[in-house]
Design a protein with these regions (language model features):
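Catalytic core of pol beta-like nucleotidyltransferases
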Residues: 1-14, 22-24, 39-129
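Short glycine/proline-enriched turns and hinge-like loops at secondary-structure junctions
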Residues: 27-30
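Short beta-strand->loop micro-motif that forms the acidic, two-metal-ion catalytic signature
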Residues: 33-36
Length: 129
């Protein structure tokens, strides 16, 4: 089955690779992070079937549904994504802009969480001495 047929069967309009393989930094045993977006809601069974179908093209697929991804994960996907399939031209570029915007909207909250965690770790270190 071709990537296009997989996309048609599951109403996928976007398939991208991200993570270490997309960055060219994979090591032996690295999985292949694949993010997909469907025009319909994907069930867990759909996700497992998509991952199994894509295993014919990529080793050890770890599948992510873009519609269910957190802003932090969207930022990671958008940062180093490599296009595998897009139903129409420019959809990939539109996704990268969307992912960046979602991440940047979340970033102030993420920064506050990091600062709070750092303060808690610093306080713990001081108590340990």
């Amino acid at each position: 089955m071709s990537v296009e047929k997989i996309a048609d069967e599951f109403s996928l309009d976007l398939i991208v690779m991200f993570g270490s393989r997309a960055r060219g930094q994979s090591i032996r045993g690295s999985d292949t992070d694949i993010a997909v977006r469907s025009t319909r809601t994907l069930s867990r069974d759909d996700e497992l079937r998509i991952a199994a179908a894509l295993d014919a093209f990529f080793p050890d697929v770890d599948l992510c549904d873009i519609r269910k991804a957190s802003p932090l994960l969207l930022g990671a996907i958008g940062q180093d994504a490599k296009l595998i399939y897009e139903r129409r031209e420019s959809l990939f570029e539109e996704f990268k802009i969307f992912a960046w915007n979602q991440y940047m909207d979340f970033k102030p909250q993420l920064d506050r969480i990091r600062e709070r965690n750092k303060a808690e770790i610093d306080a713990f270190d001081e108590d340990s001495e």
